[in-house]
Curated annotation (Swiss-Prot):
Induction: Induced by lipopolysaccharide (LPS). Interferon gamma (IFNG) decreases expression. It is a single-pass type I membrane protein. The keyword Signal applies. GO terms for biological process: cell migration; neutrophil chemotaxis; neutrophil extravasation; neutrophil-mediated killing of gram-negative bacterium; positive regulation of innate immune response. This is Triggering receptor expressed on myeloid cells 3. Residues 30-128 form the Ig-like V-type domain. Keywords: Cell membrane, Disulfide bond, Glycoprotein, Immunoglobulin domain, Membrane, Receptor, Signal, Transmembrane, Transmembrane helix. Expressed in macrophages and in T-cells. Residues 160-183 are cytoplasmic. The gene is Trem3. Forms a receptor signaling complex with TYROBP/DAP12 which mediates activation of macrophages as part of the innate immune response. Interacts with TYROBP/DAP12. It comes from Mus musculus. Disulfide bonds join 38-110.
Amino acid sequence: MSPLLLWLGLMLCVSGLQAGDEEEHKCFLEGENLTLTCPYNIMLYSLSLKAWQRVRSHGSPETLVLTNTRKADFNVARAGKYLLEDYPTESVVKVTVTGLQRQDVGLYQCVVYLSPDNVIILRQRIRLAWCQGKPVMVIVLTCGFILNKGLVFSVLFVFLCKAGPKVLQPSKTSKVQGVSEKQ
């Protein structure tokens, strides 16, 4: 095996180990909604409170929405545009943020809320970022789609023109078959 392949494999393994420490980045446009799920250990946290928090650079995270019930089947909490749905039987928390605005840019986390100073982060933190290039990307993809279709039809047209009258003339075998069928 070549040293280059070994080196690439090692780099892939190392980068995979570091990925758990990184944040998940999501970009949004004004007015969009964000929905994500946070799985948790059913044996440990099914009856614990859950929360959605904004992480500040200094000080404690700000709790935006917190469940206040510990039912075994379903717990829900709403605070403004934040909705938290806890499904203990499925061991997952569903977070929905409606009507995202520019001021929502920042770092967030989904947690098991044991106390204000004691939380357990359920998944990678989410960094919300403002998307400015998304409309441009839609235009580029649309133009690419149109150009691609134009290219396909141009090639098809060239092949049909090269085939010329051969395509339009009936073949000799069909005339012979037609005569034998009449007899």
